[in-house]
Design a protein with these regions (language model features):
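Amphipathic alpha-helical segments used for helix-helix packing
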Residues: 39, 67-97, 126-130
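Hydrophobic alpha-helical connector segments
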Residues: 47-81, 88, 117
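Short, solvent-exposed positions on alpha-helices
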Residues: 37, 57, 78, 107-112
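Helix-turn-helix
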Residues: 1-33
Length: 159
């Protein structure tokens, strides 16, 4: 996935692992089950907020690590958006809630904040993946928009 930017076939995966394709089906009922397991495993690599930093910094680290993951695995975003399961999204959502716990925001505020942020990050990741050689579009370019988002979130949560 990292080198080709697309989801490989079960046969290609088996060949890379030097195993029979049927061995993969022994552990995964179908390609979608394998994709979900791989995708969740990859998403679990993103920053895990532990509450050691201010919530603003925890959120920034989470977002930038997520974008880096999506940049490093060009086909991952498309795979995740096509999935019917919530596995990968649940990982990000849980970490988002941990990062924002000190904010004491209302549940509706957190849901709206998460929905908005996810859409923004996915749009930014898509732009990076469509222009991989564009040096003017890198993960650090989210600093300004994230700072604005964080200030707005702080104001909204204090209402």
């Amino acid at each position: 996935m990292r080198t080709e930017g697309k989801v490989p076939s079960i046969r290609k995966i088996a060949g890379t692992l030097n195993v029979d394709a049927m061995a993969i089906y022994h552990y995964f009922s179908n390609k979608n089950a394998l994709l979900e397991a791989v995708t969740v495993s990859l998403v679990e690599e993103i920053y895990k907020p532990l509450g050691e930093n201010p919530w603003q910094e925890e959120l920034k680290l989470l977002c930038k690590s997520y974008l880096k993951l999506l940049k490093d695995h060009a086909g991952l975003l498309k795979t995740m958006l096509a999935m019917t399961s919530e596995g990968p999204a649940a990982v990000f959502t849980q970490r988002f809630h941990v990062a924002l716990a000190p904010l004491n925001a209302k549940e509706t505020q957190l849901k709206n904040a998460l929905d908005f942020l996810a859409d923004y990050l996915h749009g930014f990741a898509l732009a990076m993946n469509c222009n991989p050689k564009d040096e003017h579009l890198c993960v650090d370019f989210v600093d300004g928009p994230l700072a604005f988002y964080i200030r707005t979130l702080s104001l909204e949560a204090s209402r």
